Amino acid sequence: MIIKVVLIGDGGVGKTSIARAYLRKEFQYEYMPTIGVDFYKKRIKVHAETLGEIMITWHIWDFSGQPYWKEVRPVFYEGSQGALLVFDISNLNSYRDTLTWAGEFVRNAGKRPIILIGNKIDLRGKVDKCLTYGDGLRMAKNISENFNVDVSYVETSALLRVNIDKAFTELARSIFKCLSVMEIYL
């Protein structure tokens, strides 16, 4: 089964680093903005509540967060079954912008599950004014209520590879809850 998901959020929040960490690639310390969209694949076995173990192939679309690419993004949402919506816990603007990103996702992909990710937790204690876990939970609830979609919250560190697998596993579970058995086997 192929599952298309999108990695969305402002530029510089760590979307590409999350994808690379999930694929077990080396962390890139130098920031290189994504141009348009990057694409990754990964085949894994996941546990679906009603089906047991199932093999899936993630098709991970890593969207550029730069405003310049806003006009072309809608085309890339087509067929998405879920989103990893990322903000940087040390960047309040990226946190606030998650509402805009969630709206864009729901408008273009429909009411699909979203995992809100507070990335760069390795910066807590090193950078002033980091957002808290409670802030992330509040935003997840806000997005869920505003757009009537299933939203969970996970904190990650792409640098330290903390909770990267958990974010994708949570998204898979949420997607399977929404899909019918017919959709899974088509």
Regions found by a protein language model. Name each.
Residues 11:
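Walker A/P-loop nucleotide-binding motif
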Residues 14:
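Conserved glycine(s) of the Walker
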Residues 24-32:
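Post-Walker A helix-loop "phosphate-sensing" segment adjacent to the P-loop in P-loop NTPases
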